[in-house]
């Protein structure tokens, strides 16, 4: 599943390419699984709207939309009136393509834009979700957990205070931290020198601060390298990321630790494969 760096990379790429465009026409596939809002309503609501901006919230991509009418001035300075929310699920892709680009199998949505390009949602396993929100009728989307890139020391420590669960499981809890998944939990715990089984509520303030900084550093490094392409992930242009080449523990079971040469171990924790160095992580 794409995690925070992958979703951030896609959102930035889409924003750079479609900001200021207007949605001219919408086509949705026949499968109903991706649609949190009924597809007929989504198509009707999306057509004609200006795309004001695209950003990430947690593991979701949020397209900020203006009204369904108005000229070029509104397209650039209009007020957000609606949102189109994309969750990539396990295998989802959000691509900006030429209109005549080969249609990938499992394409569930095509938005034709005023620039002549298309915004396409492709999802082979169909765990992704597409949702439309009219801000005149309800609240905009917000992730339930804290933002790992900006959370401060005190707020970060408070997330884990009294938690009787392993720190790896706590990092994966989207109600605590939005966007952290298996890859970046393993990698940040390695950088911080913390064993994934340690109880979150027993970690001291200095140890948690070390983890906060390591997590932010790992996420920023991954964004800089375009994310981790360990499976289907590609960015908005269909290009793979490179952070998988920097992984220190994730999917390196049995291989020597890059710091101390001790073999990396793999255990099952919180239902997820978990990788760590028994020498470097205490």
Model-derived features with residue positions:
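Short, contiguous clusters of charged residues that form electrostatic/catalytic patches at enzyme active sites
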Residues: 9, 154, 158, 213
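Phosphate/anion-contacting hairpin/loop surfaces
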Residues: 80-191, 199
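Basic, nucleic-acid-binding surfaces and adjacent catalytic neighborhoods in DNA/RNA-processing proteins
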Residues: 23-45, 55, 60-62, 159-282
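Intrinsically disordered, low-complexity segments enriched in small/polar residues
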Residues: 68-69, 76, 136-138, 224-225, ...
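Gly/Gly-Pro- and Ser/Thr-rich, intrinsically disordered tail segments characteristic of DNA damage-repair
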Residues: 1-127, 150, 205, 252
């Amino acid at each position: 599943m794409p995690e925070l760096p992958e979703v951030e990379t896609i959102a930035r790429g889409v924003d750079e390419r479609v900001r200021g465009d207007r949605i001219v026409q919408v086509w949705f596939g026949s499968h109903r699984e991706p649609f949190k809002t009924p597809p007929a309503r989504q198509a009707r609501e999306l057509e004609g709207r200006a795309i004001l901006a695209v950003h990430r919230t947690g593991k979701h991509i949020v397209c900020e939309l203006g009204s369904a009418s108005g000229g070029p001035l509104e397209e650039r300075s209009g007020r957000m009136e609606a949102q189109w929310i994309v969750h990539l699920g396990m295998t989802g892709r959000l691509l900006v393509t030429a209109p005549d680009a080969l249609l990938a199998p499992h394409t569930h949505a095509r938005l034709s834009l005023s620039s002549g390009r298309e915004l396409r949602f492709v999802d082979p396993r169909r765990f992704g979700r597409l949702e439309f929100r009219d801000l005149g009728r309800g609240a905009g989307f917000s992730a339930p957990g804290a933002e790992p890139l900006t959370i401060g020391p005190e707020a970060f420590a408070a997330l884990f205070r009294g938690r009787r669960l392993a720190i790896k499981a706590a990092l994966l809890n989207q109600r605590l931290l939005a966007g952290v998944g298996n890859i970046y939990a393993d990698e940040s715990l390695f950088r911080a020198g913390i064993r994934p089984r340690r109880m979150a509520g027993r970690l001291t303030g200095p140890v948690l601060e070390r983890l906060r900084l390591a997590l932010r550093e790992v996420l920023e490094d991954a964004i800089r390298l375009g994310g981790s392409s360990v499976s289907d992930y590609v960015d908005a242009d269909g290009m793979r990321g490179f952070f998988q080449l920097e992984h220190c523990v994730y999917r390196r079971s049995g291989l020597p630790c890059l710091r101390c040469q001790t073999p990396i171990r793999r255990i099952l924790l919180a239902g997820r494969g978990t990788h760590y160095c028994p020498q470097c992580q205490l």
